[in-house]
From Swiss-Prot:
Cleaved signal peptide residues: none
Recorded family membership: Belongs to the DapA family.
Entry keyword set: Amino-acid biosynthesis, Cytoplasm, Diaminopimelate biosynthesis, Lyase, Lysine biosynthesis, Schiff base
InterPro entries per record: Aldolase_TIM, DapA, DapA-like, Schiff_base-form_aldolases_AS
Keyword Glycoprotein: no
A GO CC term attached to the entry: cytosol
Superkingdom classification of source: Bacteria
Protein name per UniProt: 4-hydroxy-tetrahydrodipicolinate synthase
GO biological process: diaminopimelate biosynthetic process; lysine biosynthetic process via diaminopimelate
Active site positions: 138 (proton donor/acceptor), 166 (schiff-base intermediate with substrate)
Primary enzyme class: lyase
Amino acid sequence: MATLIDADLLTAIVTPFDENNKIDFSSLEKLVNYLIGQGCNGFVVGGTTGETPTLTHDEKIDLYKHFSQFVNKRVPIIAGTGSNNTAETIAFTNEVAQIEGIDYALIVVPPYNKPNQRSMVAHFSAINDATKIPFLIYNIPGRTGVKMEKETIVQLSRLDNIKGIKQCASLEEMEYIIENKDPDFQVFTGEDTQALTARLLGANGVISVASHIYANQMRRMYDSLYEGNYPLAAKIQRWLTPRMQALFMYPSPAPVKAVLNAQGLNVGGCRLPLVELNDEEKITLAQRLGLDDNALMQKLPLDLGKELEDD
C-alpha cells in the first residue's frame, strides 16, 4: 500500500458530473493526472468536496474502484467511509477495504447526533476494533455540529488502526495535538489558509481544496520551506490566503468547480441540494480571485499564479 509518510499536499478531490448528473469518470481521470503532475502527492476521494452525501452506496464503490485504477498506486488514496451510524460505518469501511489501491479510510466525527466526547471515543474505538483498513479521523465541527476536543484526539491517537486526523480547528489546538499525540499519528490541516503555518508547527501537511487550482503554487511554497527560503514560502502563502478564502465564499465545491470548468477541466455542476454559481456569483468570485470580472465565463488558463514566477 502507498503510505502517507511523504505526503504533504493532498487534494480533497471533487466528483465530476456529466450533463446527465452521472459521475464523469473520463473527466475525473484527466483531473487526477493533472493534479499529480502539478505536485499533489495524495488524495481524499468521497469527502466533503466530493459531495459524498449525494452519492449512493453503489456510486461510492464504483467511484473508489475507478479512482484507484486512475491513480495506479502513484500516491496514497484516502476514501471517505464515515457516517453517523457506527455499525453502518464499520460495514462500509470494511467493504471499501477490499478495493485494491485504497490505502486509508476517512471517518468523520458523527454529524447530527451530536455525540459528546465519551460517545466519540466509543464510536471510534468500535471502528478501530472492527475494521481492516487504517483510517484517519475527520474533525470538521463547522459541518458536523460538534467538535472532537484536542484531548480526545490525543487519546484516540494511541489506537492501533487510527493513523491520523484531518483537523479543521485552531492552530493552538493543532499545537497541542502535535505535541502530545502518538509519534506515528499523522496530522493534516483541513484548512487551506493554515497550510504553511501547520507545516511549520509540525503537521504532516494539508488536505486541500485550493490545490485543485493552486497546486503548483502550494508545491512551490512547501518546497521553498524545505529549502529554507522562508520569505518566499511566506510570500506565496500571503498571496494564496485571500484566494483560498474566496473558494469558500459560496457553498463548496461550487466555487472550485466553476474555476475548473472555466479552465477546461469539465467537472460539471453540483448535485442538489447545492447549485452551481450564477453569473453574478461568478463575477464576484473572479474579483476575489484577482481575475477579470468575466474570467469565469470565458476560457481560463490553467496557471493562475504567473505573477509569482519572477520570485
